[in-house]
Curated annotation (Swiss-Prot):
Protein name (database record): Hypersensitive-induced response protein-like protein 1
Alphabetized UniProt keyword annotations: Lipoprotein, Myristate
Chain segments annotated as coiled-coil in the UniProt record: none
Gene3D superfamilies: Band 7 domain
Main function: Positive regulator of hypersensitive response (HR)-like cell death. May be involved in potassium ion channel regulation.
CDD domains for this protein: SPFH_like_u4
Source superkingdom: Eukaryota
Species this protein is from: Oryza sativa subsp. japonica (Rice)
Classification via InterPro entries: Band7/mec-2_domain, Band_7, Band_7/SPFH_dom_sf
Pfam families in the record: Band_7
Lipidation (N-myristoyl glycine): 2
């Protein structure tokens, strides 16, 4: 109907390429245009100005010999001012862009190790975008943005990488646990040392109090009971201590079987041994 009345409609965000007798004549903007077909004019085709996206999957190898699939996303559009170049100079725009993407990725990724490739995704995308912009601008296309969407290693490589990361995390956790246990043991040892120190002070003070009490008892008994000697008082004190010890052993619920002599003669022998030991110690101190 439009051709019958020599009129043609061009939709929004689209341009039409008009030819006259097979030769490029003009680029028609959106709207209604007169197209006298009897003068040899016709519409050769339409070209969209909308933003388009092309996803490219490229297989390549990294510097450390790991095969990866690099997924790039290219956003591009035709320039209205160069619509004739975009329409006539390229027969398959998407294939041309894909070829440039393959070329840049396969030139960039093999220079990088796998870990570096993940870290430098933006650098790879920038290299692809620069190359595409330089090449496609001559054909009337603008490269809006280039993204490296993903880098996919082989499934076995991904599994190995996950195992390496898991092992590293377990190693860190084990080191932290060992360090915590070390701190606990150090603190426990410090606490035990402090407890033993305080216990030693308590025992020393207890023994000093016992010695002071015995000394006072011996002196008091000697004064109040005429005719007694210090030896008699010491024998009495030792007997008292002996029976107190037996009483405590018998009263303890956790006591083991203890066999000790219990007759008066045995007490006398113990007293003699203690007294002789004290005299020998005193003699040794005096000789030195």
């Amino acid at each position: 109907m439009g051709n019958l009345f020599c009129c043609v409609q061009v939709d929004q965000s689209t341009v039409a390429i008009r030819e006259q007798f097979g030769k490029f004549d003009a680029v028609l903007e959106p709207g209604c245009h007169c197209l006298p077909w009897f003068a040899g004019k016709r519409i050769a085709g339409h070209l969209t100005l909308r933003l388009q996206q092309l996803d490219v999957r490229c297989e390549t190898k990294t510097k450390d010999n790991v095969f990866v699939n690099v997924v790039a996303s290219i956003q591009y559009r035709a320039l209205a001012g160069k619509a004739n170049d975009a329409f006539y100079k390229l027969s398959n725009t998407r294939s041309q862009i894909q070829a440039y993407v393959f070329d840049v990725i396969r030139a960039s990724v093999p220079k990088l190790n796998l870990d570096d490739a993940f870290e430098q995704k933006n650098d790879i995308a920038k290299a692809v975008e620069d190359e595409l912009e330089k090449a496609m601008s001559a054909y009337g296309f603008e490269i809006v943005q280039t993204l490296i969407v993903d880098i996919e290693p082989d499934e076995h490589v991904k599994r190995a990488m996950n195992e390496i990361n898991a092992a590293a995390r377990l190693r860190v956790a084990a080191n932290e646990k060992a360090e915590a246990e070390k701190i606990v043991q150090i603190k426990r040892a410090e606490g035990e040392a402090e407890a033993k120190y305080l216990s030693g002070l308590g025992i020393a003070r207890q023994r000093q109090a016992i010695v002071d009490g015995l000394r006072d008892s011996v002196l008091g008994f000697s004064v109040n009971v005429p005719g007694t000697t210090a030896k008699d008082v010491m024998d009495m004190v030792l007997i008292t201590q002996y029976f107190d010890t037996m009483k405590e052993i018998g009263a303890s619920s956790k006591a083991s079987s203890v066999f000790i002599p219990h007759g008066p003669g045995a007490v006398r022998d113990i007293a003699t041994q203690i007294r002789d030991g004290l005299l020998q110690g005193q003699a040794t101190t005096t000789s030195h």
